[in-house]
Design a protein with these regions (language model features):
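Metallo-beta-lactamase
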Residues: 95-98, 125-209
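Active-site neighborhood of phospho(di)ester-bond hydrolases with catalytic His/Asp-centered motifs
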Residues: 33-34, 53-60, 79-82, 131-134, ...
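Short alpha-helical
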Residues: 18, 39-40, 62-63, 87, ...
Length: 209
């Protein structure tokens, strides 16, 4: 795509500093919001004259979905999430908001279930869905040439926790090795927490994977 029209923003939001991302097409005037912990992300969109086209979720934990309902109520946009994590949106025990948030989080809206290989587009942006279970059974990553949004699957020199309900360490490591580590080494990795990294760097220095 013409990168001169690409908008990419990272905003650590919420009590756990969850990285919320906006990736948009200036010419189209629309953007995807990825893992909104709060609705503060909407202020950033307005500054860039962008409207949300959809909310994309890498998984269903409460620190990644806290702003979804407010965004959906304001803009009536769909919510993309893997079918194995849909139940997290209505269950504060599963999404852990009973423990990590002042009030339990539930989300209602137009759900679009994603699967391996799906393409989600916004203007010239074309994101491919990779199923990467382990942190949750419905964990996914969103990839386009040059970058990948990985949620809590992979971090800078670390990997996502698997000691929560339905976590699976072996599945997580397998997904990282067979899905993410097959991407070009110079692919930028945008995780759910902490700083960005690159695939090649993690293949060399990440002791967990």
């Amino acid at each position: 795509m013409d990168t001169s029209n690409l908008v990419l923003m990272r905003m650590p939001l919420g009590p756990l500093g969850t990285n919320c991302y906006v990736i948009g097409d200036k010419e189209q005037g629309e953007a995807f919001i990825i893992d909104p912990a709060t609705t503060e992300v909407l202020d950033a969109l307005k500054k860039h004259n962008l409207k949300p086209k959809a909310v994309l979720l890498t998984h269903g934990h409460g620190d990644h979905i806290g702003g979804v309902q407010g965004i959906v109520d304001a803009y009536d946009v769909p919510i993309y999430i893997h079918h194995n994590d849909v139940k997290y949106l209505s269950d504060p025990e599963l999404n852990l908001s009973n423990y990590s948030n002042p009030t339990p989080i539930t989300v209602k809206g137009r759900i679009i279930e994603v699967h391996e290989g799906d393409h989600i587009t916004c203007g010239a942006i074309d994101l491919t869905v990779y199923e990467t279970p382990g942190h949750t059974p419905g964990g996914v990553c969103y990839y386009m040439p040059g970058l990948v949004f990985v949620g809590d699957t992979l971090f800078n020199q670390s990997v996502g926790r698997t000691d929560f309900v339905e976590g699976d360490y072996d599945a997580l490591i397998n997904a990282i090795k067979t899905k993410l580590y097959t991407l070009p080494d110079n692919t930028m990795v945008y995780p759910g927490h902490g700083p960005e990294t690159q695939i090649g760097y993690e293949k060399q220095y990440n002791r967990f994977s």
